[in-house]
Curated annotation (Swiss-Prot):
<feature type="compositionally biased region" description="Polar residues">
    <location>
        <begin position="393"/>
        <end position="403"/>
    </location>
</feature>
<feature type="modified residue" description="Phosphoserine">
    <location>
        <position position="512"/>
    </location>
</feature>
<keyword id="KW-0539">Nucleus</keyword>
<dbReference type="InterPro" id="IPR051964">
    <property type="entry name" value="Chaperone_stress_response"/>
</dbReference>
<feature type="modified residue" description="Phosphoserine">
    <location>
        <position position="302"/>
    </location>
</feature>
<comment type="function">
    <text>May act as a co-chaperone for HSP70. May play a role in ribosomal RNA (rRNA) biogenesis, possibly in the maturation of the 60S subunit. Binds the precursor 45S rRNA.</text>
</comment>
<dbReference type="InterPro" id="IPR022755">
    <property type="entry name" value="Znf_C2H2_jaz"/>
</dbReference>
<dbReference type="GO" id="GO:0003676">
    <property type="term" value="F:nucleic acid binding"/>
</dbReference>
<comment type="subunit">
    <text>Interacts with HSPA8, PA2G4 and ZNF622.</text>
</comment>
<feature type="zinc finger region" description="C2H2-type 1">
    <location>
        <begin position="315"/>
        <end position="339"/>
    </location>
</feature>
<feature type="compositionally biased region" description="Polar residues">
    <location>
        <begin position="357"/>
        <end position="369"/>
    </location>
</feature>
<dbReference type="InterPro" id="IPR054076">
    <property type="entry name" value="ZUO1-like_ZHD"/>
</dbReference>
<keyword id="KW-0862">Zinc</keyword>
<dbReference type="InterPro" id="IPR036236">
    <property type="entry name" value="Znf_C2H2_sf"/>
</dbReference>
<dbReference type="GO" id="GO:0008270">
    <property type="term" value="F:zinc ion binding"/>
</dbReference>
<keyword id="KW-0479">Metal-binding</keyword>
<dbReference type="InterPro" id="IPR003604">
    <property type="entry name" value="Matrin/U1-like-C_Znf_C2H2"/>
</dbReference>
Amino acid sequence: MKCHYEALGVRRDASEEELKKAYRKLALKWHPDKNLDNAAEAAEQFKLIQAAYDVLSDPQERAWYDNHREALLKGGLDGEYQDDSLDLLHYFTVTCYSGYGDDEKGFYTVYRNVFEMIAKEELESALEEDMEDFPTFGDSQSDYDTVVHPFYAYWQSFCTQKNFAWKEEYDTRQASNRWEKRAMEKENKKIRDKARKEKNELVRQLVAFIRKRDRRVQAHRKLVEEQNAEKARKAEAMRRQQKLKQAKLAEQYREQSWMAVADLEKELREMEAQYEKQFGDGSGEDEAEDQELRDGQDGKDSDEAEDAELYDGLYCPACDKSFKTEKAMRNHEKSKKHREMVALLKQQLEEEEANFSGPQTDENSLNANSEEEMEDAPKQKLSRKQKKKKQKPAQNYDDNFNENGIGEGVKIDPEDTNLNQNSAKESEDSLQENVGVTETVELCDDPKTEAKSVSKPKGKKAKDTKKSVRVPAEPQTMSDVLISCTTCHSEFPSRNKLFDHLKATGHARAPSSSTSLNSVTNSRNKKEKRKNR
């Protein structure tokens, strides 16, 4: 049987256009009508050309033919196939060659011919795009790097290009349906893969058998061992030299000054002293705290000592701020905000002095109270009600006095300045019985001075001022108070004495005095309720 590709004169990877052109050309050449002189031969050749084109023009027929081409050419698929490939089992013995020379029966000549035949069979089975160059075995004088090593590198991983289609058991063209055809193809594929694997293993085993007896490989292995031994000796000698060199360097080594720990500690202490001198004795505070903890001193004493050191000369009472350096303190004193706070604090102190100081208060007590208030003022906050009470205490008293038309003939007694709640209740009960008693409280300062409104900053500054400045809300202390009877003008040191006098004499019928006393006591009771809130 002749190959279809050879009958059409095309390659095995020819396209449909190439097949069509080749078929038309050969059909015109071998058509019987154009070969009347040799009609029989032309008719036979024309049948082969037509049969080849019928198979190769159909994609499915062409694929099946490509898979079974070798089996069809060598006997068909009916079991009559004769495999004429080289039997490699005969070359697994030492009797197939004699000696390691380059003669006809020598080791290198025999196995060189074997691998050339295997390469030829592979080229016949492979497609043109899969064809590759097979490295040759060489001879006894071949170089290891250029011939021997490439040969064994390729053939030790050899994979055949044969498809072993003649090993198939089923003809897929005889299948009745596609499921049966797929099952046949699956079984045939298993058989082909098994045969291909056996072929690859057989060739690789032959390569291993030859390599073990190849004297070129043995000579190269010996050379490599000698080179490795020489490298090991050189490496050992170099290691010893390096070790001796390191030992000499260790003997000559001297610690540098900058590596000494003692010098580092000394330098660290100097740096700490410098920072302590520049930024204050912060480290001294830590040492003092540690010492106090070790000695078991009281925590309050240590806090007071720290506060005294912290606020000693570097504290602004107006702004309630502390500073680490004098320079920062001076910069703060020059700021606009500090000046505003100082001015506001002075105004607050003046108001407090005007509201709470009595006529007999000496300058020493006034200065002491002012200093205490300056220290406490930034830390306190005022509510809206307290601010109103602070601004208009004297005005309420003046209004009460002016409404009732009294106050000119009332005398002030210095003994009864602080009134308790019991006396207030008694006076309220007695006033309900129409007791005619007048009581007038006069403050030390001029009412005009008290009535003046203090200028305050507006906007955000006013809010900051309210937050930073806080005036203690204390009950207003009255100056000396004198209690007398409006009927007989008798003076009494206390209310109890006055009440006894009124009950005994019946002088509690004066209608004009009850109104004024009610207004005074009512205003005082309102203030007491506000303070109790």
